[in-house]
């Protein structure tokens, strides 16, 4: 008679221990009529720790278990379990806690998964966990952020002249607006539209205006692969933020790349979109560890 069952897979507890030892030592599964019942994550965890053995084919058992779970979610489960958390999975989300604390959540994504950015604001877990195709794991944290600057950006209407497809002005502007071009200041499309009093066109231009209204200095983020680089004020020696405007969905690979670039230049990576008519900002950062 086998010691335990997991989704129809029979197994035995190793080293002469019984089912109650597993429940007491590892806080996994439950015992009913002398049989240890495990969920697929618990079963994989104990198997790879050498605490249980399968009665039938190892390969067929592992194929069945990983078809229910995934290598990526199992990796996240193991990381959390080894840190002493109580861990369980529910509908693709992994929850973990210590003792009676409120559970925290982890969603596991692969590098080429498509992400609905709107869910960062409505269904955001505490952490995202990725395992790349080489098996390396990275932890991400996502926090909604209220960006605020120190500038009084009341910019009056000015005259703009076009030379070719570029915009220029000789009028007085904040020194950070535009780029000096001989006796003119060369303006971006967004800057020119603003000082001419035109309505914004598209989400990116709405975000540009919103950041200005928050007292920030806003410049192009092109060389970083983002829409904007944002300074909290004139006293800022370097931009504090890189901001990417997202219409709908993103491949996680793009998010990961953007976060890495921002981190390498000591800036915070911000993604923004419009939810129910309001501009929202989230900061995505890499975390060295899952800490609660």
From Swiss-Prot:
One of its GO terms (cellular component) is cytoplasm. InterPro entries: tRNA_endonuc-like_dom_sf (IPR011856), tRNA_intron_Endo_cat-like_sf (IPR036167), tRNA_intron_Endonuc_cat-like (IPR006677), tRNA_splic (IPR006676), tRNA_splic_arch_long (IPR023516). Belongs to the tRNA-intron endonuclease family. Archaeal long subfamily. It comes from Thermoplasma volcanium (strain ATCC 51530 / DSM 4299 / JCM 9571 / NBRC 15438 / GSS1). Pfam families: tRNA_int_endo. It catalyses: pretRNA = a 3'-half-tRNA molecule with a 5'-OH end + a 5'-half-tRNA molecule with a 2',3'-cyclic phosphate end + an intron with a 2',3'-cyclic phosphate and a 5'-hydroxyl terminus. It comes from the Archaea. The keyword Endoplasmic reticulum does not apply. One of its GO terms (biological process) is tRNA splicing, via endonucleolytic cleavage and ligation. Homodimer. The active site is at residues 231, 238, 267. Its EC number is 4.6.1.16. Keywords: Lyase, tRNA processing. Endonuclease that removes tRNA introns. Cleaves pre-tRNA at the 5'- and 3'-splice sites to release the intron. The products are an intron and two tRNA half-molecules bearing 2',3' cyclic phosphate and 5'-OH termini. Recognizes a pseudosymmetric substrate in which 2 bulged loops of 3 bases are separated by a stem of 4 bp. One of its GO terms (molecular function) is nucleic acid binding. This is tRNA-splicing endonuclease.
């Amino acid at each position: 008679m086998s010691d335990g069952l997991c989704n129809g897979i029979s197994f035995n507890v190793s080293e002469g221990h019984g089912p109650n030892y597993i429940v007491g030592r590892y806080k996994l599964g439950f015992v009913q009529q002398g049989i240890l019942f495990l969920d697929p994550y618990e079963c994989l965890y104990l198997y790879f720790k050498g605490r249980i053995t399968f009665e039938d084919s190892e390969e067929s058992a592992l194929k069945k278990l990983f078809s229910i779970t995934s290598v990526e979610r199992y990796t996240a489960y193991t990381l959390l379990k080894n840190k002493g958390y109580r861990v369980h999975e529910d509908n693709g989300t992994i929850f973990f806690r210590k003792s009676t604390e409120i559970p925290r959540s982890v969603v596991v994504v692969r590098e080429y998964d498509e992400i609905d950015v709107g869910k960062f604001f409505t269904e955001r877990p505490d952490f995202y966990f990725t395992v790349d195709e080489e098996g390396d794991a990275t932890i991400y944290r996502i926090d909604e952020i209220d960006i605020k600057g120190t500038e009084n950006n009341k910019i009056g209407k000015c005259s703009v002249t076009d030379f070719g497809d570029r915009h220029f002005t000789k009028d007085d502007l904040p020194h950070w607006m535009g780029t000096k071009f001989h006796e003119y200041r060369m303006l971006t499309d967004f800057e020119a539209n603003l000082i001419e009093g035109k309505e914004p066109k598209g989400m990116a231009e709405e975000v540009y205006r919103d950041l200005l209204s928050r007292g920030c200095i806003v410049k192009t983020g092109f060389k970083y692969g983002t829409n904007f680089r944002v300074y909290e004020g004139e006293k800022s020696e370097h931009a504090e933020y890189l901001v990417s405007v997202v219409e709908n969905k993103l491949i996680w690979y793009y998010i990961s790349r953007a976060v890495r670039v921002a981190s390498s230049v000591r800036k915070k990576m911000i993604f923004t979109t419009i939810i129910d008519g309001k501009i929202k900002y989230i900061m995505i950062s890499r975390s060295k560890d899952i800490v609660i």
